[in-house]
From Swiss-Prot:
Gene name of this polypeptide: cel3B
Temperature and thermostability: Optimum temperature is 40-60 degrees Celsius.
Protein's name in the database: Beta-glucosidase cel3A
Entries under PANTHER family matching the protein: BETA-GLUCOSIDASE (PTHR42715), BETA-GLUCOSIDASE M-RELATED (PTHR42715:SF5)
The organism's taxonomic lineage, starting at the top: Eukaryota, Fungi, Dikarya, Ascomycota, Pezizomycotina
Organism: Pyricularia oryzae (strain 70-15 / ATCC MYA-4617 / FGSC 8958)
Glycan attachment points: 66, 124, 250, 304, 311, 349, 549, 588, 657, 681
Length: 765
């Protein structure tokens, strides 16, 4: 695979494209794209740009350099702090994680993690989560929230950071990333869309021990139609910062890759914010001309950048643009003047004397609970196992039913997530083999930088016992044994297991023998066995899901602080299940083909240059399963509830602008509207996620292009409406270097999942 060399530095060159299949001996390459496009201050950015331009014009060269790099400080524990310019009232920026709340501090909330949000398929809840989480970051003096996560998208099912993102699907990811960004920035903090781009595994994500970081070799069509798709939505939503990724893309490090930063992000997408690197990912000062605006931490960056400008290697205009983009983001979200707390004001060392800063607000509590409820997915429910109806006796089994033994000052909230003691000493990004179950206690998020410490953990057993006290239910439990005794009087046996994932290492598999054995052992003794899995990604269930005594299965994902309480509401029918899978669950690992394992997992000792060819193109997850006619165990978009729904009255309106070719308008123009009616034809309240899939010529059989979640009482109907843009119908033309609508027939499918299609029609273009 190779990006051919450009004939000039123009951003619109036809030469800047990849050939999908070439001789294996050839190396993928990224062409240089220069100069770095300066900020234009267009549209909604105009006022912020004008203010930033005025402020930066008063800065010296040293002051501009100072705000482009991170400094160590004892004043706070922010992940990064930029330099300040006190004489001009520039206070600097505090940059900090995490994906489910402010980490390394106290008096904050632990929101549901990204994957849990993806399973909710709920746009409004995603926005509300983003808003209230953003307010907590602001209260702590965090200027830049290092999220949300649009990459890893999830190409490799065992990848360690898939849980930080929302879903494997680029359309769903784009919508939820955009909702999060709008919420964060309306709260007054700068959102960061990350990691740009191709950061699809943890193994060899950075250079270690003389081995280069893995190179994600991706063709131009796949970049646009799959991996860059959610970043397009993020930029359109106004993301004020972006983070480049650790690994190489087409054999150039992403944070030095001018094709990615200058050509795609700042050029094609017209990104107006600033680009920062992932921590310690800088390689040389040439990154500045490649489009990088901020370095964390600084190291020798400031000295080298100043020297490069003085000797003409880097232009002063590039430095001015770097500083302007950073300051403009500050103005853009309203952090100037007295509108924002002192940077890092609530980010103190927890072991040192400090004045507590309360970040939580009462208005967020129902949002956190609703979010926890909404991301649970019911996959099996037979023999009327659920909802529970005042059982006389419940038996609870499994290590995941209770809290970890410690919650103290752990800044990464590892707790039970360290499935092996050795994990604490292992080098991130290296090949390791850890237990796939975190047996130290229930998991409410994945591990490391994407996780924060919760104010409390509502664990399943405690929540069940609280309900049992009201119902006079007798509760048995055994949380340690792999083959526990079962009281024959149990109305139901609940088995709690988990599947952990964490930044730094990819998973060793998609199931573990101990947990599977526990389920089978309980099911052999209990006729009503209900399995609940807290999972940080895909978890195989074929080992036991067809056992006649396994009556119900819940994918509980990563619900945050209200985990147990939310689950009990669902188990007892106080709330209804409405989540849908944001990924496919296969029968076996082999169903994935070559993308099951991380690239270079079998690297030879003398191979210092690991390569990862994305030869599958856009065919991942359900797109791939559909194309190869592989039947999954549970398909993308699947989820049961306590009622059923009927779909009817499909109709399609098309605009005169829906024509073949490049088109005269924007790719964001609405060119079609699809209507349908959803009716609750069951006997209980519920919510259905109506999903729209397009069959685009010369593409995967179905691609998600719309979804609407509608709550209905029994017997009630409601219309759903899907507005489709020109981009939704387009493919990326690698010759024209434009989004193009092809001539042909486009199938339109509306249904309850990617395989449960209820209504279909065609659009001819």
């Amino acid at each position: 695979m190779r990006w051919s060399s450009p004939t000039s530095s123009s951003l619109s060159l036809v030469a800047l494209l990849l050939v999908a299949h070439v001789d294996a001996a050839e190396r993928a390459t990224s062409p240089p794209v220069h100069p770095s496009p300066p900020m234009k201050g267009a549209g909604v950015w105009s006022a912020a740009y004008a203010s930033a331009k005025e402020l930066v014009s008063q800065m010296t060269l040293e002051e501009m350099v100072n705000i482009t790099g991170g400094f160590a400080t004892t004043e706070n524990v922010c992940a990064g702090n930029t330099g300040t310019v006190p004489r001009l009232g520039w206070p600097g920026l505090c940059l900090h994680d995490a994906g489910n709340g402010v980490r390394a501090t106290d008096l904050v909330s632990a929101y549901p993690s990204g994957l849990h949000v993806g399973a909710s398929w709920d746009k409004n809840l995603t926005y509300e989560r983003g808003l209230y989480m953003g307010k907590e970051f602001k209260a702590k003096g965090v200027n830049v929230l290092l999220g949300p996560n649009a990459g890893a998208l999830g190409r490799v099912p065992v990848a360690g950071r898939n849980w930080e993102g929302f879903t494997i699907d680029p359309y769903l990811s784009g919508i939820l990333n955009a909702e999060s960004i709008v919420g964060h920035q309306e709260a007054g903090v700068i959102a960061t869309t990350k990691h740009f781009i191709g950061n699809e595994q943890e193994l060899y994500r950075r250079p270690y021990f003389g081995v280069e970081a893995v190179s994600s070799n991706i063709d131009d069509k796949t970049v646009h139609e799959l991996y860059m798709w959610p970043f397009m939505d993020s930029v359109k939503a106004g993301a004020a910062s972006a983070m480049c990724s650790y690994q190489r893309v087409n054999n150039t490090y992403a944070c030095m890759n001018s094709k990615l930063m200058n050509g795609l992000l700042k050029g094609e997408l017209e990104f107006e914010g600033f680009i920062m690197l992932d921590w310690n990912a800088v390689h040389t000062v040439d990154s500045a001309e490649a489009g990088l605006d901020m370095v964390m931490p600084r190291g020798n960056w400031g000295t080298n950048l100043t020297a490069a400008i003085n000797n003409g290697t880097t232009s002063k205009e590039r430095l001015v643009d770097m500083a302007t983009r950073i300051v403009a983001a500050w103005y853009f979200v309203g952090q100037d003047g007295d509108k924002f707390p002192k940077p890092g004001v609530g980010m103190y060392n927890l072991t040192q004397p400090h004045t507590p800063v309360e970040a939580r607000v009462s208005e967020s509590k129902p949002i956190i609970m609703e979010g926890a409820v909404a991301g649970h997915v019911l996959l099996k429910n037979e023999k009327n196992a659920l909802p529970l109806k005042k059982p006389k006796m419940l038996s609870v089994y499994g290590y995941d039913a209770t809290v970890p033994r410690t919650k103290n000052t752990d800044v990464l909230f590892t707790l039970g997530y360290y499935s092996s003691a050795e994990m604490a000493q292992a080098v991130l990004g290296t090949e390791q083999h850890f237990d796939q179950a975190a047996k130290g206690g229930t998991i409410i998020s994945g591990g490391r930088a994407g996780a924060n410490g919760p104010p409390y953990i509502s664990d399943p057993l405690s929540a069940i016992q609280h309900r049992a006290a009201d119902d006079d239910t007798w509760v048995n439990w055994d949380l340690d044994s792999g083959n526990p005794d079962v009281n024959s009087g149990s109305d139901a046996c609940l088995v709690f297991i988990n599947a952990i994932a964490t930044e730094g290492w990819d998973r060793d598999g998609l199931h573990d023998d101990f947990s599977d054995g526990l389920v089978l052992n309980v099911a052999s003794k209990c006729e009503n066995t209900i399995v609940v899995i807290h999972n940080a990604g895909v978890r195989l269930v074929d080992q036991w899901v067809d056992h006649p005594n396994v009556t119900a299965l819940v994918m509980a994902h990563l619900p945050g602080q209200d985990s147990g309480a939310a689950l009990v509401k669902l188990l007892y029918g106080e709330e209804y299940f409405s989540g849908k899978l944001p990924y496919t669950i296969p029968h076996n690992e082999s169903d994935y083909g070559h993308v099951y394992r991380s690239c270079a997992h079998d690297r030879a000792q003398d191979d210092k240059d690991p390569q990862c060819d994305f030869t599958e193109g856009v065919y991942i997850d359900y797109r791939d399963f559909d194309a190869r006619n592989v039947t999954p165990r549970f398909e993308f978009g699947f989820g049961l509830g306590y009622t059923t729904f009927e779909f009817s009255e499909l109709s399609i309106e098309t605009s005169e602008n829906l024509t073949a070719g490049v088109g005269s308008g924007s790719i964001w123009d609405h060119v079609a509207i699809v209507h349908a009616t959803i009716k609750n034809n069951g006997s209980a309240d519920g919510a259905e996620v109506a999903q729209l899939y397009l069959g685009i010529p010369n593409s995967p059989p179905k691609q998600l292009r719309g979804f609407e979640k509608v709550a209905l009482s029994p017997g009630v109907s409601a219309p759903v409406r899907f507005e489709l843009t020109r981009r939704d119908f387009s493919i990326w033309d690698v010759v024209a270097q434009k989004w193009v609508v092809q001539e042909g027939s486009y199938s339109v499918h509306v249904g309850a999942s990617s395989r449960d299609i209820r209504l279909s029609d065609d659009i001819k273009i």
